[in-house]
Design a protein with these regions (language model features):
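Charged, often Cys/His-bearing segments associated with DNA-binding zinc-finger transcription factors
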Residues: 2-137, 170-288
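Conserved phosphate-coordination/catalytic loops
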Residues: 63, 162, 166
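Short conserved beta-strand segments at catalytic cores or DNA/RNA-binding microdomains
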Residues: 80, 138-154, 164, 172-176
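Short, solvent-exposed beta-strand edge segments and adjacent coil->beta transition regions
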Residues: 154-155, 184
Length: 288
């Protein structure tokens, strides 16, 4: 009898051409995206996890609940009141907290509020109105650079001890880097000689659009000059700031609340106080 030749292959000795994708253990399989490096997805997951942990630790160690802290922070940054006034307002609501504790809350959460709010702002247009105002810090006058677009939407701000070309360049770089801004087509400024020098150097280095136009027309800056009052009226009850860092953090909170109240946040009205409170609670992942 003739026996047909057959290939007997043991499972452990299976040649490579007989192995299918289904027979390979899942731990040995990896999928590669044409646009993503092998370790990128894992690094992104770690970054997301770290961000979630940072948000969870936002109110860790505080002796008051998150809703009380955010209520105090929101009201201080919204209205021209002092820390002692806010202490009495909280006491009227049966919350006993010292005004120095409220000060620490503002220093801790004002900058964080401004940072988390930026991705939720509507896009501004390319017509910038730039001006600087004065803020008293430890008995000295400092310069607060501010910029709004033609519709009055806040673009960015910067507190500086000097008023020169380097300070103007730092401000322009900071403003262009924000997620809700575009490279400007026109920049309207006052007669300060530092602005043309800063704009020319940044165009040469490719940091500003080479066709952007710098206009030194004073009356066109009425929009930003009128917008200064949102910050000036809030800083008056405090009679100035004690240090540069204290001023920088507090002003960041003032500007963030001004953006919200001007209706710059997406789908949030400027007069809808309840929606604004929910937005701030959402930014800090707290139940409103």
């Amino acid at each position: 009898m003739r026996f047909a030749r057959c290939l007997i292959v043991r499972p452990r000795e299976a040649p490579k051409f007989l192995l299918s994708a289904a027979s390979v253990p899942s731990r040995f399989c990896c999928s590669f995206s044409p646009r993503t490096a092998p370790g990128t997805s894992r690094a992104m997951a770690k970054r997301r996890q770290a961000a979630q942990l940072r948000k969870a630790r936002s109110f860790k160690g505080r002796q008051f609940t998150a809703d009380v802290i955010l209520w105090a922070v929101r009201w201080y940054l919204m209205f021209p009141i002092s820390y002692r006034d806010l202490e009495l307002m909280l006491l009227d609501r049966r919350v006993e907290v010292d005004h120095t504790t409220i000060f620490r809350w503002i220093q801790a959460y004002a900058v964080e509020l401004e940072k988390r709010l930026r991705p939720h702002l509507r896009m501004s247009n390319g017509s910038w109105r730039v001006d600087e105002t004065y803020v008293k810090v430890k008995g000295r006058w400092m310069y607060l650079y501010r910029a709004v677009d033609s519709q009055g939407q806040t673009i960015d701000f910067l507190l500086s001890a000097k008023r020169d070309a380097e300070a103007a360049k730092r401000f322009f770089r900071k403003a262009v880097a924000q997620p809700h801004t575009v490279n400007p087509r026109t920049i309207t400024v006052d007669k300060n000689a530092a602005y043309p020098k800063a704009a020319a150097e940044m165009k040469k280095d490719g940091e500003l659009w080479r066709r952007s136009r710098l206009r030194q027309v004073k009356y066109l800056n009425n929009v930003v000059e009128q917008d200064h009052r949102h910050v000036k009226r809030l800083s008056c009850p405090g009679l100035g700031f004690g240090s540069f860092q204290t001023a920088r953090r507090t002003l960041a909170g003032y500007e963030a609340m001004a953006m919200i109240r001007k209706g710059q946040a997406r789908n949030i009205g400027g007069r809808d106080i309840k929606a604004q409170a929910k937005l701030i609670a959402m930014l800090f992942e707290v139940a409103a």
